[in-house]
Amino acid sequence: MKKGLLCAVCAWLFPIVNGMAQTQRSMTVDQLFNLIESGSNVLTAQKTGVDVASRAVEEAKSKRLPDINASLSASYNGNVLMTDRNYSNAKGFSQPHFGNSFALEAQQVVYAGGAINSGIRLAELQKQRSENSVQMTRNQMRFVALGQYLELMKLSNGIKVYDSNITLTTKLIDDIKSRQKQGMALKNDVTRYELQMESLRLGKRRLEDQKSIINHQLCNTLGLADVSIEPDIDLEAISDNLDSEQLLQTEAANLSPVLQQSSIDVKMAEQQLKLSKSELLPKIAVVAADNFAGPFTYDIPPIDKNFNIWYIGVGVKYSLSSLFKANKSIRRAKEQLRLSNTVHSVAAETVNNNMQQAYTMHKQSFVELRTQQKSVELAQQNYQVVNNRYLNQLALITDMIDASNIKLNAELQEVNARINIAYTYYNVRYAAGNI
């Protein structure tokens, strides 16, 4: 019996000792966001993607530069064999055996049907898309981490509510035991409140375990280890004096990364259409070349001299196959543009709906808080009345338990309502795209 009791006490004390061993760290919302920025591998990878996109822009712009090629060669030339067309009357001629050649070629594209400019613009838009993806991920990670952060605060406050009710119930049990000794209460009354106490302790333990789980998940998100995060946020500073819904809708339309992403996709589809149409246009370039070589082998016998040939001119190139191939890529590009415009319209509608919902829920959260505060006030009054009646033997123990449960539930709901104000406020900022 004693051994079992000792094991039970150790099991109950272990999470407390373990929690005490864990380092506590007070954290504001700004500190939370800074840790996400510095500790997120996902954000680091996406920022690297922006650097890659920047290099792609430089690469696309380099296509405006001239193409210059140089070649240098030395060779051993064999003697010449010449025959008639029927392969008879063969004759041999000696020629200089050492050959050399140096060639220099340059080409500058002056018109490519807009293909080069469209390629550069596509690369720039891809860079913007990468930067916007970083912002989208940053907002998402901040909002998810903030939800865990506020959940920790909610659980911590809930544990305090349980502690308060456990203290109150302990005092009540002592009072009932005292009355039992005086013959004014039954053993069953004590038993019922001891059961109530066990229920309170179990409820508190559940909140503590849930807090441990959320804390572990948040630490992983922030790149922290073995730290007990204590939220530090002034809930009273959050008011319902937001801008009007219309101003917030305008802000969301201008700042929402979701809308910006779909807008960039539309612009990329437009450039892709221009790129496809450029296949139907000619390509014009200025060309120049110089060739210094020897010996001169275009005469018989060959002349053992070096000679130099150069030219400069304009080259025009047109792909005749584009007349029956380019139309397919153009049709595909047009369909992609239409799809991108549709997706952008859907995204705008979604952002508008999300902002309206977030704004309405934030306003509603203050109504809920006032309602829950009134409920707590009434529940506490009811508890005091029932407690006084019970002490005067005018109420049953079941009435006391009901009043205690109503009071506990009201206090927990008030805690949830107060935290919900902060959550709905940041949800408005998230919907606007600037959390």
What would you call each of these model-derived segments?
Residues 247-293:
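Acidic, glycine-rich loop-and-beta core segments that form the ion-binding/anion-interacting portion
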